[in-house]
From Swiss-Prot:
Zn(2+) binds at H196, H198, E203, H245. One of its GO terms (molecular function) is zinc ion binding. It is an enzyme of class 5 (isomerase). This is 4-deoxy-L-threo-5-hexosulose-uronate ketol-isomerase. Catalyzes the isomerization of 5-dehydro-4-deoxy-D-glucuronate to 3-deoxy-D-glycero-2,5-hexodiulosonate. Gene3D superfamilies: Jelly Rolls, pectin degrading enzyme 5-keto 4- deoxyuronate isomerase, domain 1. The lineage of its organism: Bacteria, Pseudomonadati, Pseudomonadota, Gammaproteobacteria, Enterobacterales. Disulfide bonds: none annotated. Pathway: Glycan metabolism; pectin degradation; 2-dehydro-3-deoxy-D-gluconate from pectin: step 4/5. It comes from Enterobacter sp. (strain 638). It holds the Pfam family KduI. It catalyses: 5-dehydro-4-deoxy-D-glucuronate = 3-deoxy-D-glycero-2,5-hexodiulosonate. Its EC number is 5.3.1.17. PANTHER family: 4-DEOXY-L-THREO-5-HEXOSULOSE-URONATE KETOL-ISOMERASE. The gene is kduI.
Length: 278
């Protein structure tokens, strides 16, 4: 488990490129037949990936010890979105078939969660966010057909994109975790511009569906103290509440967003005009 401490905005603006990457970038999300796990002190979110290839993968008791509990989800809820080939997730003996871009919410208290791929030549890639939970909501599969896509932006401003809200109150109940997937139209490069912050929630972006020679310049920092991180395919970035989170790519891309914090009101955000950015 890679533990990331909270960081004050006044400290963050003094960091150089490598220091910013050390604090906020999750460089390697998927490793064959293993789980990766980054624990952030910011709202206690856990972020990572699971890619079963030659065997099944489960999160063992060693993580429970690190979290001070008996097992991983004793006091947590889990959200998973599969960006790879078809797979399965077995939760306490109940098997869910999770295809490409299908998702699974796993409620607090699930003791055994086992991840598998249907074909080792086309492994599933389970990206997950995990957050503290105060009560148990039912485990539920969510498919792209279950969400209501919302298209925003314009080709003229190179930010036409479709937002798919997987784990939001209109789709299913969670304690605090919200997740979704945003896909840019071909030829569009910007996400979340004009940008915003949200004082009451933190957020993690996971960029994927990118060519090897492509990158995203992810914008972060306070609106008047912006910085950037250069990100490549299948990398994630932690965004504190005080930070903007926007990006521009060399080509179109897709990203998964996950939020935890005070509320789940999607539009509860503090907008920042482009003219006010520095």
């Amino acid at each position: 488990m890679d533990v990331r401490q909270s960081i004050h905005s006044a400290h963050a603006k003094t960091l150089d490129t490598q220091q910013l990457r050390n604090e906020f970038l999750v460089e390697k999300v998927f490793v064959a037949d293993e789980y990766t796990m980054v624990y952030s002190h910011i709202d206690r979110i856990i972020v990572g990936g699971i890619m079963p290839v030659a065997k099944t993968v489960s999160v063992g008791g060693e993580v429970g010890k690190q979290l001070g509990v008996s097992y991983f989800l004793e006091r947590r809820e889990l959200g998973v979105i599969n960006i790879g080939g078809p797979g399965t997730i077995t939760v306490d003996g109940q098997c869910f078939e999770i295809g490409h871009r299908d998702a699974l919410y796993v409620g607090k208290g699930a003791q055994e969660v086992v991840f598998a791929s249907v074909e080792s030549s086309k492994p599933a890639k389970f990206y997950y966010n995990c957050a503290p939970a105060h009560m148990t909501y039912p485990t539920k599969k969510v498919t792209p057909a279950d969400v209501s896509p919302v298209t925003l932006g314009d080709n003229l401003t190179s930010n036409r994109r479709t937002i798919n809200k997987y784990f939001v109150p209109d789709v299913l109940e969670t304690c605090q975790l919200s997740m979704g997937l945003t896909e840019l139209d071909p030829g569009n490069l910007w996400n979340t511009m004009p940008c915003h912050t949200h004082e009451r929630r933190m957020e993690v972006y996971f960029y994927f569906n990118m060519d090897e020679d492509a990158c995203v310049f992810h914008m972060m920092g306070q609106p008047q103290e912006t910085r950037h991180l250069v990100m490549h395919n299948e990398q994630a970035v932690i965004s504190p509440s005080w930070s903007i989170h926007s990006g521009v790519g060399t080509k179109a891309y897709t990203f998964i967003w996950g939020m935890v914090g005070e509320n789940q009101v999607f539009d509860d955000m503090d907008h920042v005009a482009v003219k006010d950015l520095r």
